[in-house]
Amino acid sequence: MKTLLLDAHSICYRAKYSPLVGLRVGNQFTGIMYGFFRELHVLLKLFTPDRIVFTWDSKGSLRKKLFPTYKENRYTRIQTAEEIAFDEACSKQFVMLRDEVIPRIGFNNNYKFEGYEADDLIASIVQNNLGDFVIASSDMDLYQLLSDRISMYLLSTKKRYTERHFIDEYEILPKQWVRVKSLAGCSSDNVGGIPHVGNKTACKFLTNRLNTESKAYHAIISNRGKSIARRNYDLVCLPFKGTPVIKLGTDALSISELKLVFLDYNFRSLLKPDVFNEIQRLLRGGSYYGEKQSGCGKSVKT
């Protein structure tokens, strides 16, 4: 069985900065939801999965208990009133998709757990379920999960990324990536690394190719360097400690409900006969398909 694992939060976030984000029906903004379903159509065509799983970040993070400044650099200046209003309008669409629209259609593998991030849930899923997985995300932390049955589709480059691609690029095994990030840190999450050490330098250290006279080498083997690496390991290793074990269930997809969603939000391009028929055909090809009664979807699993 081939499962498409969506970092749904990441897909929505990318749609937030698309030219179509301002779409609306009445007073309801719909651009993020439209962008989400358009991306889903693309992914269905690319991978023809048997099953689709949606994973979401929670608002808070348990990692902050280990590292209080975790992800605190997301805003480097005070937001304007317009920017705050825009963020709030976008957040409403995230929640509507997660809690109402996706369950309404009958996708039952839809997960959010308080304190955990989408990549934690993705890691739990691939570790506790059989089959092949394609992870749709741009989160480089997920590289540590790559294997002969787990690949990625990088949303940022729109390219497939496999275990072989990773080994060719970094000259280490995917399971060593967590050690790389422990040494180098992650600037996007405000997790500082060891001074003078980036991803490539960390890879050289792990494969004994780093000059033992270099500043980076001595920084890594110093007491401070070892302390930073120990702290970072728990932050970057997936899944984070305590992440629930997730066993995937069965969907009960309703094509009629999907069509009603597209009608309700005026997603006209997705309702064109050739487009909608293709979406319907691709979804019906999955083992999750089973026509359910309207309105019987389950809410997000938390």
What are these regions (language model features)?
Residues 42, 46-56, 71-77, 82-85, ...:
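Non-catalytic nucleic-acid-binding/docking modules located in mid-to-C-terminal regions
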Residues 135-139:
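Conserved RecA-like ASCE P-loop NTPase motor core of nucleic-acid helicases/translocases
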